[in-house]
Amino acid sequence: ANVVEQYVQEIEERLIEETDYVKELANGVEALDVAQNHPRIVVPKYYPELSNQRILTMDWLEGISLNEFIKNETNQENRNIIGQALVDFFQDQVHSKKRFHADLHPGNFLIIDDLKLGVIDFGCSKSIDNEFYNQYFSLVKDDVLNDPIQLKKVFLKLDFLRETDTPEEEKMFTDVTVKIIELVSRPLRSESFDFGDEQFNEDLQKLGNEMNDNQDLKGDNSIRGSQHALFLHRAFIGLFGILYNLKSK
């Protein structure tokens, strides 16, 4: 299958899973387990004995919407606390369980009393295997990014490069991908990061515009990257969007 078909198949699989209550139940139970490590995260308790293919039973979480919190909360420290709780929970899911909430938008979060973050709707979750995980996250390491031979090996395994690429294509896609990685991974490579920094958001928009204007990045040949990265990228975009709106540090 070509890369477009692989992407379509990946999206189809996630959409089908969103209608599978048995799968969502398992995802929710696992997320509840991860939440035990995070005092500020609340995941509803699920009831397997009261659930089936058509019914999903869980506790009701009482709180205000994350959008309401973003709109009305004036204490930046409180905004930072919620942002940090979300980052810690997501990172734990990715790095410990290698299965994560892949639908990170404000509608799936509630602010509960005492500054706790309620997380709901685990219908869209994505699992990643060890091989993909190791290759993908090696790209935030300087010793990989700065080693052209090692970098090419990883890019080939992650489908950012193809064996059939011409030398010109290889250079172009390598340069573009490294530029994206260096910018987007900036928060992951920093001890602390201020998502209220407008410069980061401006840099993202500038890079997006540059890529959009680059005619060499049009067409099927420019669609690069493993299908397994699709929902991981979607999750990071959602995460960064929430953190930007919170102006979290």
Question: What are the residue ranges of the model-derived segments?
Answer:
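Conserved catalytic-loop position in the HRD/HxD motif
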Residues: 98, 103-105
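Juxtamembrane "helix exit" motif at the C-terminal ends of alpha-helical transmembrane segments
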Residues: 33, 101, 244-246
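Helix-rich C-lobe and terminal helical cap/extension of kinase-like folds
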Residues: 52, 61-63, 68-85, 112-249
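Conserved ATP-binding subdomain of kinase catalytic cores across diverse folds
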Residues: 1-67, 81, 85, 96-97
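Hydrophobic "anchor" residues on beta-strands that sit immediately upstream
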Residues: 55, 101, 117
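Residue-level signature of catalytic and energy-coupling elements of molecular machines
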Residues: 24, 57, 105, 121, ...
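Conserved hydrophobic core/spine positions of the Hanks-type protein kinase catalytic domain
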Residues: 88-90
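Hydrophobic residue at the +6 position relative to the catalytic HRD Asp in the kinase catalytic loop
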Residues: 107-111
